[in-house]
Swiss-Prot record:
Protein name per its UniProtKB record: FAD-binding monooxygenase ausB
Phylogenetic placement of the source organism: Eukaryota, Fungi, Dikarya, Ascomycota, Pezizomycotina
Binding sites annotated in the UniProt record for NADP(+): 126-128, 269-275, 292-293
Gene3D superfamilies registered for this protein in UniProt: FAD/NAD(P)-binding domain (3.50.50.60)
Record's cofactor remark: Binds 1 FAD per subunit.
Residue sites binding FAD per the record: 116-119, 128-129, 134
Gene name linked to the record: ausB
EC identifiers of the protein: 1.14.13.-
Amino acid sequence: MASAPEVESVKTPDPASTKTQHTSIAEIHTADQTWNNESNTRLPPNHRHHLRDTRYDPWTHNGSPPAEISKIPPRAKVLILGAGYGGLLFAVRLLEAGFQPSDILLVDAAHGFGGTWYWNRYPGLMCDIESYIYMPLLEETGYIPSAKYVPGEELRSHAERIAQHWGLGTRTGFGVRVEELRWDEKGIRWDVRGGRTQDPTMRWTCTADFVIIATGTLNRPRVPDLAGLDMFTGHVFHTARWDYNYTGGAPGTPALPRLDGKRVAVIGTGSTAIQIIPQLAKSAEQLFVFQRTPASVGLQRNRPTDREWWEKTIQNAAPGWQRRRAENFNAWISTPHEVLGIEEDLISDGWTSAPSFAAAIGGPLNLAPDFLHRATEVDAARRRIVHQVIETTVKDRRTAEALLNHAHGWCKRPCFHEGYFETYNLANTLLVDARDHQLHLTHDGVQVGDTVYPVDLIVLATGYELGSLCPATRAQVRIVGVGGQQMEEKWARPATLHGIMTRGFPNLFFPGTSQAGVTANQSYMFDRAAEHVAYILHALCLRRGTETRLRLQPTVEAEEQWATRSVDQARAFAATRACAVGSYTIAARYESADGAALARHLPWGEGMASYVRVLEQWREAGTMEGLEIVSE
């Protein structure tokens, strides 16, 4: 077994600095202050150091070579950016609406289907949303997930299954990074420019009548500006580009044989870190975990899918079971249980047991006068349970106290795992509490204060660049609309129709979070947006004939009315104003914005169910209210 970690010098922490903070309602202001203090010590976000150009695809050797870029069609009726779950859902809903495969073209910078599940293949990877509601189109494909929470390889394989089921393989261009979308007013189309992901000198152009941006948000690995990073002589990589050539092993296999005798550092303790840390501890000689703000980690209680239960409960259910189950989940995470008024909790996991997360995603009671008090009370109870698990699991008292998370549950996405806290009982694993120090790299290690921790490998579990919510920024695409206006200019004061269209950028759809409903299950969000866009394009294109050229965009009045309606719900997210900069909450990312500007970037405050009802009512009316439609 590996030996206990060794360091060059040891600085004994002040016991007073690690004193446990309790989180009862009476002392919640203390927890707020603790979180505010922690926020000031987070990793500096700017001056990106690209260890390896993120265009590099380490998985190309695992699949068939991408088609020659010249063979990717230069013309599409509907161009979809992204071939992950989001892009696939848009393609499938369009096909169901009556479009032909030849009408659709998907392009992706990756060399295979899966989106974030293509790029992320680190050891221990799995979804943290129940697979029965997260893996899309289970009902249509007939696939039965292997477990309540499935590993990453199964998630990626399911994306390939969807593509094969609907014949999308021949309608997808892989290894293509779109760089610019430019509206051609005369041609009533989008001119698309890009190039090979790994060789931008190989150019690709395309024209499309309609463009859908379905790239998601987890597509830009965040590499912090660590002092001394350039002088470190060991190996470094980001979890989104796991280097199995260095660690040994392969995706889907837990063993990392080449780490035998290696000293490994993990920087970051978010949702990715809590999955890789137990795996690294099994293989590394020594493991150092550098933590600034502890994660809130609840028990996941994963289990294999019971086939008898599946046949009885799922296969015999009426059509639409997956959507109903997903909406049950949405309700339970956004509404206090005592006022829910719906059937049983079908998911029954860590997410649905603590609905205080509604403070981050919106909900039907968020605008009630007592919401903040109610959410704080529920969240304090959740936090006490997590603290009790830590205190009864982790043997070393200082380590246990350092692992106590004092933040509100809505400030960072909660984590769920089995075995994370137990890892800190292993002799070869050391938690380094770095909340009071900036990290510095030396030529052979990581320095915190006066202590240097010698390491051979640094794994950056530092997440993704969230930054602006602008569709162009999220997709890393320059979008130029009518009259040369750039999307970033429009997004300084965004106005949309339904959160997916904006005036000045005709025939462009961009599902996101601003002025739209959100939930923890992103697959559900994509599916509702895909359903809505498919309805619009079916009604306007197929009913008028495929040869009709259309120019559609919101009217000025309609998008301002929608923006105002969304802004009126902004106080639903008042609780997130206290969250630290660097968390994923929108208010934190727009800390310098005034209230009116910030409110336009926020989601639909009344929650996902309210948002979906509004879209359904709009479609039922059948009038295309708010759309300016010009046909030739």
